[in-house]
C-alpha cells in the first residue's frame, strides 16, 4: 500500500451526464431514488441537473429543498452567461439560484474553436462571461465549481488561452477548476503531463486553503476515462467526476464503480467509508435496474463475473488461496466469488458447486467424475450451464441418485394459428396439449398462450396445479434463444435459456435441440421441476402432493 494520501472528493454526474446516454430516460422518482442511494453510499457531491432547462429538474431541486439529503451536497449545473448579456437578467442563472443549492457548477469554454465558431463571440468576451458569472454567483452566496469544457483539446490548440480561462475562473472565486476531456480523445500520458503543467502555471501547490483545487472530468471515447482520471489524481487533481456504471453520452463517462475501489484500495486515497464501499456492487445493480439497462456482468469490481472462476486449475488454486487469482477480496466491494461450471471445469469446480447446492460429494465419490464427464459431453452437444445453474444442480442430483421425478411428461402437442383479417390487426394464438403422469395418475390438459412456449408453459402448470398448488406462483420471467450453428440454416441446433420465478427466487434452466419447441420444452419442464424441488426438498412424491 502507498503512504496515506490526501482525501479525494467524488463528484457524481449520473443524474445529468449519465442520463444523456442513449436509451436512458429518468423520471423524477428515478432521480430522487438515485440521489438518495448515492447519498447513502457516501458520495460528497451529486450533480442534480440543470435548473430551468426542464420542469422535471426544477421539481427535483424543489423536492430536495423540502427533504434534503443526509450528507451529500446536491449541485445545480449551468453554463456561463450568454455573450453580451447581463448576469442579473440571465434566466438560466436566476434558475440556478432558485434551486437553493449551496454549490453550483458552471461550465465555460476553454477551446478557442468553440468560442469563435460555437458561441460566435470574441476570446475576450468569453473570459468576461466566465468572470462575471462566477463573481455574480459568489456574490449571491454560492460556492462555485468551474467545469472547463473541452479543456484538453483547448490546451493542445492554444495553451495560453486555455490557461487564461482557468486563471480567470480562479480570480473570480471558483473553488475547483475541473479539467474536462469532453470529447474523450486525450490519452493517459497527455493527461498527466498537462495536469502537472496546469498546477504549476496557476501556482496550485496545495499550500493554501484559499487556493482553488483541480478536478478531472473524463469521457470514455478512447476507452481511457478511468486511466485518465487516475493519472490526473496522481498529478494533483483532488476532485474526480464520473458516473455510476460509466453511463454517459456516446461511449460514456469515467466509471465511478471502477474508480472508487482503485483509488481507495489500490492508491490508498480516502474516498468513502470502508463499510459503505461494501455497498458499491448493490448500488451499481440498483441503478442499472432503475435506468432499465442490463448490468455489465464483466464490469471490474461490481460485475457478476468480476470474481468468477472457470478453469479447473484456477478454481483449485483460488480455493487454497483466493489471492492466487483475485486482486482484492470480493466482499470489500460487496461482490462475491463464483465458481463457473463448463467444459473447462475440473473436479474443484464440481465440488465447489456441490457445496453450494448442499450436496454431499467428495473427490473419492465415483459420481464426481460421472458428473464431470456428463457436463463435458453435454456442452459438446451445445448445452451451457454457466447461466443455467438450476439445470446443473438437477444434473448433479441425477448422478447422485437424488432426483426422483415429481411428475412425468408423457408427451405434448402445440398448434399455432396466424390469422390476419383485413379489418383487424394480426391475431396470433397457440394451443398446447400435454399428457402428464403424477403418482400413477394420467392427466390430459389443454391451454392457450401468446405463442407456443407460453401455451406449453400454461398447459404444464395447469395439469400439475391440482397436485402441486404451489405452481400457481411460478412464472416464466425470461426466455432467450441462441442458434448454435447458423450455417446449418433451418436445421440448426438451438439453445434455449428459460428464467423462472416463484416471487421470492429466480432460477434458470437450459434446453438444446434441433427443434426449438423441444429445446423450449426441456428448459420449461426442468424449470418447473426445479421450482418444485425448492419447495419440496427432502420430501417423497406422496408427501409433496399431500402438502
UniProtKB/Swiss-Prot annotation:
Biological process GO annotation list? isoleucine biosynthetic process; L-leucine biosynthetic process
Q: Where is the Pyruvate carboxyltransferase domain?
A: 8-278
According to the lineage, what is the superkingdom? Bacteria
Catalytic activity of the protein: pyruvate + acetyl-CoA + H2O = (3R)-citramalate + CoA + H(+)
The answer to keyword Transport applying to this record is no
What is this protein's record name? (R)-citramalate synthase
Gene, per the UniProt record: cimA
Protein task = Catalyzes the condensation of pyruvate and acetyl-coenzyme A to form (R)-citramalate.
**Record-level Gene Ontology MF annotations:** (R)-citramalate synthase activity; 2-isopropylmalate synthase activity
EC number(s) on file: 2.3.3.21
